[in-house]
């Protein structure tokens, strides 16, 4: 027997074909959401408060300090929040201290700071009753970046940019004349020496002393001449910078100093964030810049005076490591004191080294480092600016390297916590202005924190973020996999990110640093390709928001692969060589071969085993969860795998789902972490179990109660239904499944079914990927799903009186009211069809249209039907089904309703949708198709043992698409069915062709895995043997019931009077310009005329035509289309005297819209009236015949 048995949870064993020992379990798959939010609660929120506070008033006599905060219990439980359309949020109370500096008086007070949405255990938020997800954003990391560009003459120039988290950009660039310029905040450029002089180093010699002598420096100094001798060089430089930043304003050195300080050196206005400081220190660090350079001076220890490194030594990694302590200490540190006119007058500490130029051995190049400012310094320092300039000048000398902006070391993730902190900061900053004004205006003695704090800006910022940010998305709830994928999604779009139109190929492309961090496969097709990605299965965020991936460390001394796990970011990995997970190892962990396949930076090649630093932990660490669910992924073309991964997320939960015979072993973990199942929180014993709740007695005697959700409507309209897995007496451990969620079976993800599939053509019905299906799949409800639709009706107060929910609906027969209760609301369990009343509702209508006689009769007989209009909630087109639930919300019951609403009724209708022609099906390899015919079981081809085939697919769908994985799955699936086992074939480590054939033999199948197939209609065998097997097929969310739509008459657009478009508006089919050409080509003038008139916007014509058709009379000639009248009116509005004349030169009168017509209704009413009139006439005729 090939393979070995592996247990997945307590309910499933699979035969696995994996050969690689996994040394690390998958992390919790939604930790990117939950950990980030937890960090926000633990420290992020506190940091935001500490950033903005304390706040002082303008005279500095009062100060408001932050003390701490506390979350109280949420107002609603999760379930109550869903039912009441509320948010699941907890009130936050913040303690402030108000200090009066004149009297020394301190007032401490707790202030309510609004309700803050809380993340559920599943990593989602409930906002206004809907489940939402905050998608993590992929953005450019703050830091310093260097780039090169080639001009039109082929000359290489360099550029550099310091990008903060918030604040002004500082750029450097060279031009074609070899002069270096700087730009502050995207303004006009100035020589870079001008900025150096503004920092207090004004002499030319001083500048050359700092940066060393080079052509770029000399050229720039020559360009930067002293124009105004009355000013010092520093003052002149400051004025020049001020002129660039504030053109047209009077320039003084003092205003320039304060402006530059505010732009770069004030921590409140300029923030690099922790990650920006880390990146700058890493880039400008002397150690990395000296690596592999030849030192041009003796390095002398300042304390002992000994020579650490002699001039002429190559600074290899080992040399640098030997003097690492001194490099981090005071080695070659110089203190430069700026002059008194400088922006920042504190001394500047720089680390300076001289190295031999790599281009010209006779030249010496100076390298200036920023002497590693402390991590807490979040603003820029003069040392940073000088070190950046030095790196930039060194690039022209052939030292240092330019940055690749698409490298994942330069892109980071802003997860939920950080996005929320940023929103909160925005709200607090708005509040700060408000607080400062109130502190200054009001009387100091009576002020309390409560009085001066207005929380509205903060709550508004948070509310706006959750409600309308591009990154706050309605959860994709088609199935557990789509939930999981959505929580792990990384978007480069959104505020502060890219835009679809500006993103080029480079940003979207797969980069070598994606390995183990972002999935190269799973991304949407279309305009967002490559901008929306998914976290790889082992991906994890570090404290700076860079994605790390785990590797097994290699002990290079003994050449053994250890089980020690090291998590590396992309730029850390660049320094090492990493071997693949399938490298052959001896039992003691040493490499079995001298040469192994590995990766170093962007190169995939063979390396000597002795050079390898790390080994991948798992073959599936490259791909995301959805991709890791595709068996035989290694045999599929990547474009089809992309479709396969995306289509699994569109699978509809079926009534009786089955886990795949051929899985990848990922199904258990995906189901477990998705949040859709019920998982045991503690060890214990089941003491009660039914379909709605399970009780578990813990070992310490306390009782855990788990509620099972039955048939709740999911965000996408499918049934969210959980099924209990345990029975009384079962022992459960923490993490065990208590109940399966939707699309799960026995604790594994089960998106579809395992039908018997044959690759063969049949009467041409599977042309172009169409799917032929057996009637068995319809009759036995194999692909049947339940869909729940929600309809609501509310009663409001109108000008003419309140609306009313009632059973007494005017002009409706008793038959239409048979399923309504005494209130006029449909009973639960009623079967409803299109047009049936769900909630009877009447709205008062004005009496302006009554004549005097009618009013008199009305007053005498009290005819109620005249006063009200029927506005009942009816079942829309395609909405028929069974009423599953009715919820009634009223103020009397204490429900919160919108202002003006007195009562709200929600009706849930369940539909059982069997698979039918036009539904979309797919396998897991991107092989998708539409059901084209459902064939009776007796007509389907059958196997030699009489088993009829379930599905027939076109064999032509395989070769050109190169997704051979489906054929391998087919054969292995048949073997698994015959053997009665389930199989796991993990990606890149699954069943080989030898394993496949061995399992086929074991299952007693023919040696070519094909079979003779008999025609169900004739009983004759087909000419050739056919590939028949079991393939996992899923039914997708694109169902024909949602798309098919037909209209006779319906709503019309107000201005053009043409039918609306689309199913949602019950619209017509657009007969466009090209379709008109087709009719013109055949001279079909009558058809063309009716399309442009009756069927479109000839208002009177269509009314008359309708009447003529219903009465059986000939159809009258058409009139003038409304859009022609609109054209005439538009031309008249331009002041043109436009008239329409007939052939006798008489003016044609166009009907006017405002001739007593009700123009606030789309003109369905005219047709409705005609219809009612017709019905009335028919009824009168029927009655008169009865009387006779």
From Swiss-Prot:
Transmembrane segments: none
Chain's role: DNA-dependent RNA polymerase catalyzes the transcription of DNA into RNA using the four ribonucleoside triphosphates as substrates.
GO biological process: DNA-templated transcription
GO cellular component terms listed in the entry, alphabetical order: DNA-directed RNA polymerase complex
Catalytic reaction annotation: RNA(n) + a ribonucleoside 5'-triphosphate = RNA(n+1) + diphosphate
GO MF terms, alphabetically ordered: DNA binding; DNA-directed RNA polymerase activity; ribonucleoside binding
Protein name: DNA-directed RNA polymerase subunit beta
InterPro entries the UniProt entry points to: DNA-dir_RNA_pol_bsu_ext_1_sf, DNA-dir_RNA_pol_bsu_external_1, DNA-dir_RNA_pol_su2, DNA-dir_RNAP_su2_dom, DNA-dir_RNAP_su2_hyb_sf, RNA_pol_bsu_bac, RNA_pol_bsu_CS, RNA_pol_bsu_protrusion
Pfam family, one: RNA_pol_Rpb2_7
EC number(s) per entry: 2.7.7.6
Subunit structure: The RNAP catalytic core consists of 2 alpha, 1 beta, 1 beta' and 1 omega subunit. When a sigma factor is associated with the core the holoenzyme is formed, which can initiate transcription.
CDD domains assigned: RNA_pol_B_RPB2
Native species: Streptococcus equi subsp. zooepidemicus (strain MGCS10565)
Top-level class of the enzyme under EC nomenclature: transferase
Family annotation (Gene3D superfamilies): 2.40.50.100, 2.40.50.150, 3.90.1100.10, DNA-directed RNA polymerase, beta subunit, external 1 domain (2.30.150.10), DNA-directed RNA polymerase, subunit 2, domain 6 (2.40.270.10), RNA polymerase alpha subunit dimerisation domain (3.90.1800.10), RNA polymerase Rpb2, domain 2 (3.90.1110.10)
Protein's UniProt keywords contain Transcription: yes
Family: Belongs to the RNA polymerase beta chain family.
Keyword Repeat: no
UniProt keyword terms in alphabetical order: DNA-directed RNA polymerase, Nucleotidyltransferase, Transcription, Transferase
